[in-house]
Design a protein with these regions (language model features):
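Glycine/small-residue-rich loop that forms an oxyanion/phosphate-binding "nest" at active or ligand-binding sites
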Residues: 1-2
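Residues that cap or flank secondary-structure elements
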Residues: 5, 51-53, 81
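A short glycine-rich, Lys/Arg-flanked "PGG" loop and its adjoining helix->strand segment in the class I
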Residues: 5-22
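Conserved class I S-adenosyl-L-methionine
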Residues: 22-52
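A structural signal for short, well-ordered beta-strand segments and their strand-loop junctions
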Residues: 24-25, 71-75
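Short alpha-helix
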Residues: 52-68
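Conserved Class I S-adenosyl-L-methionine
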Residues: 73-158
Length: 158
């Protein structure tokens, strides 16, 4: 892939930042996509489409270094949940407004959405929707949902 648009954007960050200036990038890593969102298990095709557009963290580090950034490090706030308390509402899956809180749903086909809604309604009817959410949310505690990458533009030497 080569990530040409990412490289172009990072070059622009380097161009406009003063020497010694800081850059903070928040992103969701491919692993976080797979492990950090309980409902992504229901929409694997959409998740794969989204992952195609997400740069892995090692490649991001390499691009930052290539563009003159240094002191590259990252933080993963494991306690941060992007949708807040509503993320833990398993019935939100059935609510279009809840789904509008995550852009991944725009990648879900109408047919797949219909299947997901039927599955959600069946789990709800059997009283298993909450346990489904809890079971598939366990891995989030280890991966988090978002990564903050910090880098500093190198200071020009005379």
């Amino acid at each position: 892939v080569g990530w040409p648009t990412h490289l172009e954007a990072i070059h622009e960050f380097a161009r406009v930042l003063k020497p010694g200036g800081s850059l903070i990038i928040n992103s969701c890593s491919p692993v976080q996509m797979e492990m950090g969102f309980w409902f992504y298990k229901l929409i694997p095709d959409a998740m794969e489409l989204a992952k195609e557009k997400i740069i892995d963290l090692e490649t991001l580090d390499n691009l930052l270094a290539k563009c003159g950034f240094m002191e590259i490090h990252r933080e993963i706030p494991l306690e941060l949940v992007l949708q807040g308390d509503s993320y833990f509402d398993p019935e939100g899956l059935l609510d279009p407004e809840w789904r509008a809180g995550d852009s991944i749903w725009s990648l879900v086909t109408k047919d797949n959405l219909a299947e997901v809604l039927v599955m959600g309604e069946e789990l709800q009817a059997k009283g298993e929707l909450f346990s489904f959410m809890r079971r598939h949310d366990r891995s989030r505690a280890k991966t988090g949902q978002i990564t903050f990458t910090y880098a500093r533009k190198a200071v020009e030497r005379l």
